[in-house]
């Protein structure tokens, strides 16, 4: 059913599942959302001539304004945000190589020498920059995101000569309903994402099913800041009522005042904000004030989630003023009866990663 291939990569195709649903592959990316057929009909329609008439009619029957519920506003907000992002921009004020160390190598407690050949789900990959960088470690990466921002991942492949394009697979889909088989990945990485879904815990639970026995699941979430969270939440009651495109323009206008605020906060030693460009400041505003959902959590709360889902070990990481990280490991088959434990010190693999940086 593919209409074109480049270097053996399928660029345009139609996928179907056992339940008879159809999903298009557009520009090399499977689009696994309920309304993907409708959104990409200009690409889909020419492919129908390659199908038997009854199957082509089945595809046409999948076009419906009520194709299924998912968080469309979040998709629109983050699609705009990642479209505004440019290759070379820092994310959260942190350069790409530092993000790989801080939000993957340090937290997961897996020795770097053991990473090649493992499958990692980058759950909420954004523009795909980190997904691409992870292939340099020998990881096979499923880069999953609700937004269209993952289309920019190809730009990062061009900028990262050590990245392996055969090891990264971009998929547009909903983390609340991950289009993946049970027990298919070794590591799940989700930094700054789950709190932007309607139900953080529910999304966490649905992702757990795709993890293999012995697998590792790392998340980073917002936490409540005394006073600050209350002010931010009050402002969000206004900003999240704006159309995403309107607020994106507001964020660009407000970026210079936001930069000035950060400069003053640093000068009086109230905060230690990293330096950012005007565009990076606008992106931060879009993330903080534009996302429809922004839930705050705590490490003890999240520890209970891991225990409920059968993890035997969990440990804290990346604790800072805005949020915190947590990482847990499922038992291997032979360790299923191990008691649950919270580990407060770095694991051996984490120390090894530090030595190799």
Task: Describe these PLM feature segments.
Residues 1-121, 125-179, 187, 294-295, ...:
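Conserved N-terminal segment of class I S-adenosyl-L-methionine
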Residues 186-198:
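A short SAM/SAH-binding and catalytic strip from SAM-dependent methyltransferases
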Residues 201-213:
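A short glycine-rich, Lys/Arg-flanked "PGG" loop and its adjoining helix->strand segment in the class I
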Residues 216-247, 256-263:
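Conserved class I S-adenosyl-L-methionine
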Residues 226-236, 274-294:
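Short, glycine-/aromatic-enriched active-site segment of Class I SAM-dependent methyltransferases
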Residues 293-309:
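Short alpha-helix
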Residues 312-316:
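A short linear hydrophobic-aromatic micro-motif
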